[in-house]
Amino acid sequence: MSLKIKDIKVKGYERVIHAINEITKLDCIIAIHNTKLGPSLGGVRSWEYNSFEDQKKDVLKLSEAMTLKNSICGINFGGGKAALNLKNAKKTPELYQSYGEVVEFLKGE
């Protein structure tokens, strides 16, 4: 399997992972900010990031915002978000299939 997943420690976040698939060109960071109200809920931003740090900064900001949005709405979900870097990839079914494998790896976190 060409999918590689690495945990990244970030203060104030429950879990942050970086996933790479060399075959599909997946370069994805998933950030789970807070699950005190329930499992994380958020979406996917597909963007051409100039650097890993830009991608990480964006996904951290977005996942924290999802925690706040879900709390304000009074729903029982925490905040999470994914950022896919499209700088070296095209939006293909294979790319998003490999992203789905990363989500499956988290088993509902």
Model-flagged regions — what are they?
Residues 1-109:
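N-terminal ligand-binding/catalytic initiation module
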